[in-house]
Amino acid sequence: MSEDRKAIKRALISVYDKTGLEDLAQALHRAGVEIVSTGSTAAKIADLGIPVTPVEELTGFPECLEGRVKTLHPKVHAGILADTRKDDHLRQLDELGVTPFQLVVVNLYPFAETVASGADFDDCVEQIDIGGPSMVRAAAKNHPSVAVVTSPGQYEDVVSVLNTGGFSRAERTKLAAEAFRHTATYDVTVATWISEQLSAADTELEFPGWIGSTSTLARSLRYGENPHQSAALYVSHGASGLAQATQLHGKEMSYNNYTDSDAAWRAAWDHERPCVAIIKHANPCGIAVSDESIAAAHRQAHACDSVSAFGGVIASNREVSVEMAEQVAEIFTEVIIAPSYEEGAVEVLSQKKNIRILQAEAPVREGFETREISGGLLVQERDLIHAEGDNPANWTLAAGEAVSAEVLKDLEFAWTAVRSVKSNAILLAKDGATVGVGMGQVNRVDSARLAVDRAGEERATGSVAASDAFFPFADGFEVLAQAGITAVVQPGGSIRDDEVIEAANKAGVTMYLTGARHFSH
């Protein structure tokens, strides 16, 4: 037996999730391990006909306060925390009549699941585990002497070492690290929830006074934004979205694949109608909606800028049909992401060996988003199409005549789509599709010129335009008017609004003001 291995002679088991408990208890019993257990765990083991010592028999103190106090006792924690490498600790154990544990198996009350179920405050508080984390942390601290297991997924490892002298020191250290991560995640979940409750109760406190989050390494990526940068994907606990997407086909996702897919996924789901968004370098090559079919939406989105769409990322907010898949298969595409795929669509797409096919749940649309800055974190409410000014019914007609219902529908589409464009952003649209996108320029005039240039004379004529922020001068608007747009929607709010509105009236272009802005940096 290696000197750093600790044979398992005595185990303490207290688990809420009983998955795998039967096999574990039977294996421990066959190996001659003494089992001490609590409450329903002890009852489950006893029902298997396996000898088990209830913890109250060990402590001489009954379980009380509706189960809130079971294991918080020196005879339990001394047996966990005793460093058996130290003669003084062994002497004290002998004096106290305490036998040490070599294995602690604990999983915790389902606090996060209780919160997610919509339970009331008191029920959530009742699911905050106290004794469990105390035992886990004690065993993890004392990993030179004790192995700690916090997940049914680790039970096979326990069984495999029972006849080989127990876990090695390195293995116990690894288990301890996993245990500390487990309790840290649990504590962050509790602390975040209770901070949110305080914020909700205090109308003057818009943001919680404390923010915590935990993420787990999902996989290393080939490299980051550039080949000289290392990178990895971490998944957030309790979250769902792109990071948890199922990859149905293709090469491993890259860092840039993820950033573009995230932008595309969000852009597609900004729209309630069937929508396809094609993204490259986090900016739209094309976005389109269609009540005819998702394939029609894809054709229109691709037509906006077919050159830039080469090697792009495609997102659909509806099931991808075989018809759409056949269209996509004709174009080099890095990633396609959708909530589902019609039978046969994946097979069609898979003819392209390298395309990455993802299936994901709809993105989280509420809540807050964060951005790291040097020395801190910026937090803001996620920008959604839900401001009062995003509803055309609340727009102000500032110039020209009211447009028809069809043109207003195009204006609403353009206004929704421009949120996905990096500022300064100008977007031209016609018939539910973008026809020209001007993005990321440091002045609005250049964004307008870029949008018009991308559209070309034929498509720009008769289109409508959206600007993510106000026109500071009339010059940006005049570029659009000269290109032949019929209507434009913009936030307004410039000190030169009168000048811009006057230019619209002179050009015979209808102008709506939203009072809302959608910068994106």
From Swiss-Prot:
InterPro entries: AICAR_Tfase_dup_dom_sf, Cytidine_deaminase-like, MGS-like_dom, MGS-like_dom_sf, PurH-like
Gene3D superfamilies named in the record: 3.40.140.20, Methylglyoxal synthase-like domain
Any matching Pfam family: AICARFT_IMPCHas
Keyword hit for Hydrolase: yes
Sample GO molecular function, one term: phosphoribosylaminoimidazolecarboxamide formyltransferase activity
Catalytic activity: (6R)-10-formyltetrahydrofolate + 5-amino-1-(5-phospho-beta-D-ribosyl)imidazole-4-carboxamide = 5-formamido-1-(5-phospho-D-ribosyl)imidazole-4-carboxamide + (6S)-5,6,7,8-tetrahydrofolate; IMP + H2O = 5-formamido-1-(5-phospho-D-ribosyl)imidazole-4-carboxamide
SUPFAM superfamilies: Cytidine deaminase-like, Methylglyoxal synthase-like
Keyword Transferase: yes
An annotated GO cellular component: cytosol
Record-listed E.C. numbers: 2.1.2.3, 3.5.4.10
Residue ranges occupied by any MGS-like domain in the UniProt entry: 1-150
Keywords, comma-separated and alphabetical: Hydrolase, Multifunctional enzyme, Purine biosynthesis, Transferase
Biological process annotations from GO: 'de novo' IMP biosynthetic process
Positions of transmembrane segments: none
This protein's pathway: Purine metabolism; IMP biosynthesis via de novo pathway; 5-formamido-1-(5-phospho-D-ribosyl)imidazole-4-carboxamide from 5-amino-1-(5-phospho-D-ribosyl)imidazole-4-carboxamide (10-formyl THF route): step 1/1; Purine metabolism; IMP biosynthesis via de novo pathway; IMP from 5-formamido-1-(5-phospho-D-ribosyl)imidazole-4-carboxamide: step 1/1
Comment, domains: The IMP cyclohydrolase activity resides in the N-terminal region.
Family recorded in the similarity comment: Belongs to the PurH family.
Record's protein name: Bifunctional purine biosynthesis protein PurH
Source taxonomy: Bacteria, Bacillati, Actinomycetota, Actinomycetes, Mycobacteriales
